[in-house]
C-alpha cells in the first residue's frame, strides 16, 4: 500500500513506520508524479486546487483521503467522490490556534490596538486612546469584561474559546442549528438569531462554508446589531455579504469588523475593506498549523488497515 504525504507539512515519516505502507512525499503545488498514481492513501494539506483536481482524475486506486483542513470543501470541490473514497478531515486540529487568534482579534477590537498602531505609523501620539477612560460605558465595546459575546457556529472551536472569554469576564451565548446547553453555555437555535443580535457587543462567526451559510450575515441582520457592535469572522469568508458589511461600516451601523477570512482570497487590492478605519484584517492566519496531525494520521491509518470506522469521516 502506498501513502502520499505532503511536503507542505513538517511530518516525521518515522512516526508512520510499522504500518507496512510505502511512504512517499509529494509537492502540493504540482501534479502527482506518474509513478505515484497507484497510491491508495493521500494526505492533503494546503494543496492547490489544480493539484487536487489532477489527483481526483488520475489516482484511480485511491481508497482514502485524510485532509488536515477543518472541513472537506477543498477535497469535495476537486471532484473526489465520498461514495467511493473514504474522506476524513482535520476537525479538532485547529481548535486551539483558531480560538487563540479569535481572542486576539477581540482584544485588538475592544482595546483599539489597531488605532494605536495607525497613529504610531504616522508618528503621532494617540492621546485620546490613553489616560482616563470610561469603563464599561453603555453603548461601547472597549473591554471583554461583562461584554456580550455571541458565537455563531458553536462547535469545537467555540468550546475552546469560551473558557478564555469567561475568564476575562465575558457573557457568552451561542447560536447553532439546534438549541441546548453545551459545555455550560446556553446555545440558541437560529430561529432566535434576531433577538440575540440586538443584544450583542461582539459577534464571533465560526460558520462552515456551504450553500446554506452563504451571506448568512447580510444587510438585514447587520442592521439588527447595536451600532457599537463588532463582527469577528474566523469561519468562512462566504458567510458574510462583504458589500453589505462595507455599507454598514460606511454608515456607522456597526462599530467595526475583525476578519480573518474573505469571499475571495487573497483579498483583492480593490477591496474597500483595506481603507476602513475600524477594520482589522488578517490573512487567513487563524489556523495554518494543524496540531496533533501526526497522531490523527497514525490513528486513522491503524483504523484503515483494520477496516474500522475512521475518525472525522464524512
Which residue stretches match the model-derived regions?
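Hydrophobic/small residue at the entry helix of a nucleotide-binding pocket
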Residues: 157
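Phosphate-binding beta-alpha-beta segment of Rossmann-like dinucleotide-binding domains, i.e.
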Residues: 85, 90-148
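Short glycine-rich, flexible loops that bind phosphorylated cofactors or substrates
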Residues: 49-52, 73-74, 211-213, 239-240, ...
